[in-house]
Amino acid sequence: MVSVKASAAEKKEFLQSQIDEIEKWWSEPRWKDTKRIYSAYEIAKRRGSVKPNTFPSTVMSQKLFKILGEHAKNGTVSKTFGALDPVQVTQMSKYLDTIYVSGWQCSSTASTSNEPGPDLADYPMDTVPNKVEHLFKAQQFHDRKQWERICDGTIEESEIIDYLTPIVADGDAGHGGLTAVFKLTKMFIERGAAGIHIEDQTSTNKKCGHMAGRCVIPVQEHINRLITCRMAADVLGSDLILVARTDSEAATLLSSTADSRDHYFILGASNPAVKGKPLNDLLNKAILDGATIDDLQTIEKEWLAKADVKLFHEVFADAAKAAGKDQSVIDQFNSKVNPLSETSIYEMQALAKELLGTELFFDWDLPRGREGLYRYQGGTQCSVMRARAFAPYADLCWMESNYPDYEQAKEFAEGVTAKFPGKWMAYNLSPSFNWTKAMSVDEQETFIQRLGDLGYIWQFITLAGLHTSGLAIEQFSKNFAKLGMKAYAQDIQKKELDNGIDMVKHQKWSGAEYIDGLLRLAQGGLAATAAMGQGVTEDQFK
């Protein structure tokens, strides 16, 4: 550190040392595919006069990067699922190399307001960071407990578990503007997250990725979020893994038309008969006149049909056919205007006028919904366009989808890697999908690796912790009500013993021996109140 009362020369020397250190850090292979729009100086001067400590989460981020790199190199997959609590984390660590923390699960089971609800990201913004801290502290505790045994030589090599499994957490849509994104990222780093994902939905209208009514923000607005996440990590000296998620595949709304990259996908009224007659004006008047919900739905449906709401390239195709033009004119237009061309509405109108000799009627303001949002028609190619824009600012790209569709996943992967070869990708193996209907049992077994072959190196079941917990408790409760202690003794305890589950000795699992050791150390080697002394019932399991 440097004293703020130090000489100007000393402060300048400290600042330069920070700049040099940051530039050296950014020159590491870890950052070869990461784009930053700011200099090391801009970060150094915002770190304060005390050099940042190395957060434990930074070590975990480095570990996660190495894990993902090995999977990418070997053509394998890091697969995991959403953990609810320390019990699940300690058992998962035996078999999986990453842990996921789901916003959905937190929304229903762990909100810091203690008010459960669906996944609308309307819980306090520290909810998911709190859960990360809960799990990470448990990981650290179980690691300390085990390390003591390793040092004492009282544990077999085959028993050793790597409890420090990197955690990737759900950052939702950032919980507000860029300052909120910065603070949220900071919280995640301080509380133990090795990585986070952040999505391109609006924070005010955020929905679960498998709900209707999803509204995305302009491309550049989400890029700004990603830049802010990385900036926060840089200020803290963190190697945070950043996953860019797009919900545009099934998005039906857009918050703003500010970014021309979105223009291809925005729906507009194509019938001049509705010119000067916005849908919202009609709805507002109907409300004042006492219209019911059913009335409003009918008015909206009839207006949309009359307005003939379409994408601009569809309007052009209709106009070309009406003017007697052949398919070559439409093909000429589509060769310059397509999902990945990033053509603005002004360029589309100019090209249409050049090819048809007239400007086409197209108004995307007229059909705006009650919240003032624009109508949007996403899709896989829309997701490709967005992922390509996000890729330079994130370590992995992820398209949220409505079905476990291999061909769609392939289209997305090929679209992204065509521009960014070798780009790492993530896939949500969502329990919202009906897997039994989606594919055969054999296909279920190979699905993860088939996606892995496409570049999806990190895959996760968001809510498996929730569902397995619910299933286990439902079944045990039913059997316990009917069979009494036989249900516990035979279905739980005996299976724990038969399978060598460490939790059967729950006192030892909870660290009672470790804490006894601390007590003895503090009291010169003796502790009459040791929890694991003579009389502990766990001796029955020897």
Swiss-Prot record:
The keyword Cytoplasm does not apply. InterPro entries: ICL/PEPM, Isocitrate_lyase, Isocitrate_lyase_ph_CS, Pyrv/PenolPyrv_kinase-like_dom, Pyrv_kinase-like_dom_sf. Induction: Repressed by glucose. Homotetramer. Belongs to the isocitrate lyase/PEP mutase superfamily. Isocitrate lyase family. It comes from Kluyveromyces lactis (strain ATCC 8585 / CBS 2359 / DSM 70799 / NBRC 1267 / NRRL Y-1140 / WM37). It comes from the Eukaryota. It is an enzyme of class 4 (lyase). It catalyses: D-threo-isocitrate = glyoxylate + succinate; (2S,3R)-3-hydroxybutane-1,2,3-tricarboxylate = pyruvate + succinate. GO terms for biological process: glyoxylate cycle; tricarboxylic acid cycle. Pathway: Carbohydrate metabolism; glyoxylate cycle; (S)-malate from isocitrate: step 1/2. Coiled coil: none annotated. PANTHER family: BIFUNCTIONAL GLYOXYLATE CYCLE PROTEIN, ISOCITRATE LYASE/MALATE SYNTHASE. Mg(2+) binds at residue 170. GO terms for molecular function: isocitrate lyase activity; metal ion binding; methylisocitrate lyase activity. Its cofactor is Mg(2+). It is found in: Glyoxysome. Transmembrane segments: none annotated. The active site is at residue 208. Its EC number is 4.1.3.1, 4.1.3.30. GO terms for cellular component: glyoxysome. Keywords: Glyoxylate bypass, Glyoxysome, Lyase, Magnesium, Metal-binding, Peroxisome, Tricarboxylic acid cycle. This is Isocitrate lyase. Substrate binds at residues 102-104, 209-210, 245, 428-432, 462. Its main location: other. Catalyzes the formation of succinate and glyoxylate from isocitrate, a key step of the glyoxylate cycle, which operates as an anaplerotic route for replenishing the tricarboxylic acid cycle. Required for growth on ethanol or acetate, but dispensable when fermentable carbon sources are available. Also acts on 2-methylisocitrate.
